[in-house]
Structure formats: C-alpha cells, structure tokens
Amino acid sequence: MIEYLSLQKINALHEQEIVEAVEKVVRSGWYLHGQATERFERHYADFIGTRHCIGCGNGLDALTLIFRAYKELGVLHDGDEILVPANTFVASILSITENGLQPILVEPDYETLEIDERLIESHITDRTRALLLVHLYGRCAYTDEVAEQCRRHGLLLIEDNAQAHGCRYGNKRTGSLGNAAAHSFYPGKNLGAMGDAGAVTTNDDQLAQMVRALGNYGSSRKYVFDYVGRNSRLDEIQAALLDVKLKYLDEDNKRRQQIADRFYREIDNPRITLPGKRRWLNGEEDNVFHIFPILCADRDALQSYLKEKGVQTLIHYPIPPHRQRCYAEWGDLSLPVTERIHREELSLPCNQTMSDNETDLIIDLLNGFGRS
C-alpha cells in the first residue's frame, strides 16, 4: 500500500536530530517561554522574511489572534466583513465568526482552486475591511492584482499560510506578503510538529505585541492582565523539533515539486483534470504541494479504484463550509464552483518520502482509469 502520508517516515528522515533536540529540552527543565521557542521564532521570522514571529497553540489560534488583535487595536469592529475563499478549510472561517466578524464567501477559480481574483471587487461593500487570502493546497494565491485591489479599497491583507510553508512569490515568501499571516504546524503539514503548534508572522510591531499578549492570557507582564486573552503558546518541545525540521524545509519541498512536476507532465487521462497545470508548467506561480489535488467527475469511483490497486488517497474536503451544520444559515447560498470542487477533488500522495517507483505506479494507474 502506498500511504497518502506516513508521519513515521517523514520524521525518520531527521529522527536523530529531533531526538537530540527534544532531549535537550527535557534536560533543561524549562518547557514554556524558553530558549527553544525564542530561537525558532527568530529563525522562522528570518525564513519567512518578517520582523516578528509569535508562536502559538495552533493555526486556528493564529488566525483568531490576528483578528482579535486588530479588534483590540480598533482597526476591526463587530460586524465588519472579511472576504474569504468559499472552498477553504473551515478553520479559516471559524477564526472570523469567533471574533464577531462577518465572512463573505468568494467563489474559487476552477483552474487554480484559489480565490477567483476576478470576483473580489464585486463582493466589496462599505463594511468590507479585510481579505483573508488562503494559500490552499500549498499554491501561492497572492497576485499583484489581489494586492492592488486591497490597496485600492483600503483592505487588510491577511494570509492563511497553514498549507504553504516555504512557498514564494518572486523573491518573497508567503507569510510576508500581507499585513499579517497565520501558520499551522499540524503534524501533516510541510513543516509539521508532533502535536499542535502555530505561529503569526508580521512586520507590524504594534500588532505583534498585541498578538503575543493575547496569546498569553492577555498579559505582557507577569500577573498583569491588560486584555481578556487566552492560553495559546508554542511549547519548548514543539519549537525545538520544528527548528530542526525548518533547516530541511526547502529541500523537502523541492522533492514534492519534483513529484508534482511528473504528475503534471505524465498524467494523461481525459477524465482527470489537473488544476494549475498550465500555470505551473509555464512557471507562472509557485507551489509547495502540501496537497496535490486532482478533479474527476467520477471521484468516488476513482478513489475506490486506486484503493483496490494499493494507493491511499484523501479528499480535501468532502463538505464545503457553507454546507456544514455549524453554518446552517448559509445553506441557501449559491456557490456552484465551490460545490463542484468539493464533489470532484481527490488528493494524491505527494511528499518527500515517496520513491520514483511509487510515483510511476500512481501515474500508470491514473492513466489506466476508465480505459479497461
């Protein structure tokens, strides 16, 4: 069986260094707000290209803290509208509604699966205050046109970089392109912890100070609480092992890109659509392929076929946010592109532990689907 993703294999690549780093933390007797966290925050800020990195508990907390910080600073207010891609993972939207803000769902582009920049302007009202730009599946969703629309309308540009660690736009990395960015280090991510972890990156000194305080119970001085905060901190063990894995992130992403490039060039089946193929092959965008999505009208049959042949796949995601019970009030929204993507999307194995032979098999099986 070709597993979709084996975390055991992923971590085995650097196991000795990880074990040594964790043992050092264990022996130190210091498990929060210590040197390992400070070191990782400094290294990750340098990697992303921002002045600040603030570690926190997970990616959802990172987004939630950004919106909350902007409210405390008087930039955002209850009921303000935040544009967000309709096909994102639900955490993006949870962070908005948790802060008393109003998500405005914008359809994606079927060719790229990212927010359709042609539709952004038509969704802007006098209550719109920000765009939450999600680099979904590892593909850079930022464009000069998106940035210009935000500038023209005075919108905050907030990045959800949970799936695109190391991705670039020109000579800058995602996570440094907007006013602030949220990062998730969930174990399955390209830069993954061994538990939950996240971070906020920004060049805004005031925002960084507020995010750090809000994630520490609302405190910037011990036992003095200026805000109603929460407990969302990056612990020393997660920080230490993330610092090890960060050194290899570009190398690991390069292997993902090599496999994805073969998928784009060698998968040839009229029943299967490869989103982003033209842009990738033309060098028009960067992608670190956290997920390699394909689209197929017979998605469920294709998934069963691959499973029978020994290839595990996943679906990202089977139910769109506006069809989830938690957002039942949106059930009447007409989002046909989003719903089509959620019906057709299938995620192929694509990671740095895969062999050429495994890649060969996946390509051969896909090219043979429906051609018996």
Located regions from the model:
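N-terminal "arm"/small-domain region of PLP-dependent enzymes with the aminotransferase-like
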Residues: 1-30, 35, 309, 349
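PLP-dependent aminotransferase class I/II
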Residues: 8, 37-42, 47-54, 60, ...
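Pyridoxal 5′-phosphate
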Residues: 16, 76, 256
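Phosphate-binding glycine-rich loop
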Residues: 30, 35-81, 95-99, 105, ...
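Structural detector of well-ordered beta-strand residues that form the stable sheet scaffold
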Residues: 54, 83, 104, 157-158, ...
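PLP-dependent aminotransferase-like
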Residues: 71-136, 140-161
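Conserved active-site segment immediately N-terminal to the catalytic lysine
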Residues: 159-194, 221-226
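Short beta-strand-to-turn element immediately C-terminal to the catalytic PLP-Schiff-base lysine
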Residues: 183-184, 198-203, 243
